């Protein structure tokens, strides 16, 4: 006998839903635009004390508003706003976590039902066709640039950190593309 039949029904529904593919997961190149965002870091302080705005890209990793970007896109900001292709106004975001060593940051916007990208789980090897998605050159125009993986793991020096084990590729990355996803033909 069940003490709480409502709870039992909810549990059954949840386990059935886990077997179904989430409709918010992007599964093709045409829909990647719905998971990629333009990020504005507000109130950055430069070496002379002036305030400036930093701009970069990012992408949803869950339907409940979590976004991955590069740490250098949001580092030192006093506030972060996210622009999408499906809203007219910027959405305020909060910084959840950062890693200077990996040049990664996680930010979050309120809401749910966002389209998002799944992680690529297959082998990465030289010659793999890839695409860099984002909003380059501080514009509001989304771009998708193609290339191939040229080296599976590379180390590099940047002006903001030493970065280890990144994917070396031939897709053009312009200022503003930072933080955007590198994806395959299935949007992963």
Residue ranges of model-derived segments:
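A cytosolic small-molecule/anion-sensing beta-strand core signal
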Residues: 61-63, 184-185
């Amino acid at each position: 006998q069940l003490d709480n039949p409502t709870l039992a029904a909810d549990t059954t529904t949840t386990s059935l839903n886990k077997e179904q593919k989430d409709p918010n997961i992007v599964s093709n190149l045409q829909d990647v635009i719905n998971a990629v965002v333009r990020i504005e870091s507000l109130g950055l302080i430069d070496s002379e004390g002036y305030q400036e705005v930093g701009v970069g890209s990012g992408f949803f990793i869950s339907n409940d508003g979590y976004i991955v970007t590069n740490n250098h896109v949001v580092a030192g900001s006093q506030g972060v706003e996210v622009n999408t292709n499906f809203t007219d106004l910027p959405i305020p975001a909060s910084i959840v976590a950062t890693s200077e060593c990996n040049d990664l940051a996680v930010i979050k916007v309120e809401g749910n039902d966002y389209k998002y990208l799944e992680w690529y789980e297959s082998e990465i090897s030289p010659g793999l066709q890839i695409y860099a998605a984002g909003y380059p050159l501080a514009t509001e125009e989304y771009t998708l640039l193609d290339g191939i993986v040229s080296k599976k793991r590379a180390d590099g020096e940047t002006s903001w950190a030493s970065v280890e084990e990144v994917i070396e590729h031939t897709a053009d990355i312009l200022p503003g593309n930072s933080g955007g996803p590198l994806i395959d033909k299935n949007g992963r």
